[in-house]
Amino acid sequence: MSIPHINKLSQDGRVRFSNWAKTFSAISLGLRCPKTEEQLREILVDANSNGKKIRVVGAGHSPSDIVCTSGYLLSLDKMNKVVSFDPDSLSITVQAGIRFYQVQEILQNLGYSLPIVGSISETSVSGIMSTCTHGSSLQHQVLPHYIKSMRIMLADGSIVTCSRELQKDMFAAAQVSLGALGVIVDITISVVPAFDLVATEDVTTVTDLFQDWKNNLIWESAEFVRVHVFPYANRAVVWRANKVEPNTVPHTPKPSLFRLKLDSFVYQCLLFVGKCVNRVTPYLERFWFKCHYGSKLGTALQVAGPGFDVLQMFCYFSQHVSEWGIPLESAPDALEKLINYTVDDAGKIGAYTHWPIEVRVCAPTPEDECWLSTDCKVPTCYIEAIMYRPFSTSINYKPYFKALEDIANQYNGKPHWAKEYSLTKEQLLERYPNLSKWLSLRKLLDPKGVFWNDYLQRHLG
């Protein structure tokens, strides 16, 4: 089996894993690709009996070392079927290895849709849920909230079925499992009738963004909202989208792949110039922004199409990413501090930042579920910093990420599990009231640490 981010190194089976961005890699003992539950059971029982380590690997999109292991990688790509679809209960059951976009394609043909998605959909269903992916809407929670039930194979080969009604603690822990409790075999997810979205992009100044935020004219102004902030250009782009009935509004043609690739190439060229001559980075951001949005404020773009398609974003190229969830009421202060750092402080240490700062939101999950959800159990704002690697070159991203982390820590921020952060178990225990219960359950389910790795040891060990 050929997986793009996994390369065979030798005849003894060793492989090198690299994540999509090629920012993290590891040499593993081998790759296992079961097709059936019985094959999966044999792999896990062997690992459990012989002291082997296993980490499940999917599309490799996590911008961290959460997958990396010196043990064995386990790909569920061949366990990627739809198990059942039930329109009466508005649910679909799929095997864990299926990609999110594949689920949506099947649902769309049936006249249904996933309720909300993140920015990309090439990731596996189990990976999306296990790391607490989210979209951007105060009317929707993180994606694991929409899980109805799961079947999980433990390290000893036994299978546990859990839901809100059955094995409640197991379910609350496994909604965001970090791949540390067992291997998700299949998963039942809520669906909704298909919908289209009409989306607009509005250009505003940073000052006006904060004023509109204060007046509840941003996050409450549409069902789906996200904001991109361009600190050096003193601009923000507010993306809003609302549902309409399918095919009631003409669909906007998608940008051609050539145009996207060309834009990506030009973007890399600009950032590479900024890498070589760091002080010109603010001018490059202003130039890029003007080329894309012009000089005028107001509506810059309107598009319409199937909801799933409109919610997706084009992922340009290799990047480092850090994202933090903080209470929405504290977010304007936090964002203003990050903007001030970018404009006033980053250049003084020769560490100008890339653009944009992405800002998203979600509704709170109930207290008794999603123990490791990155929402704050109140309306939550996610602030994300991106530092690109133009033409795969190294970039000085750590000062920017430390600044964001220091700011987020002032509000007891929660880091995205699959992105870069430095918190330890002691710090995370203060922010996750149920983390101690999660850790105890993990030890009970996997006493030999089959699914443990360096990432988990660093942050939770």
From Swiss-Prot:
Cofactors demanded by this protein: FAD
Entry EC number(s): 1.1.3.37
Modified positions (Pros-8alpha-FAD histidine) in chain numbering: H61
Record keywords, A-Z: FAD, Flavoprotein, Membrane, Mitochondrion, Oxidoreductase
Entry's localization field: Mitochondrion membrane
Pfam entry (one): FAD_binding_4
Principal place of residence: mitochondrion
Stated family: Belongs to the oxygen-dependent FAD-linked oxidoreductase family.
Name this protein carries in UniProt: D-arabinono-1,4-lactone oxidase
Organism listed in the record: Schizosaccharomyces pombe (strain 972 / ATCC 24843)
Lineage start: Eukaryota, Fungi, Dikarya, Ascomycota, Taphrinomycotina
This protein's encoding gene: alo1
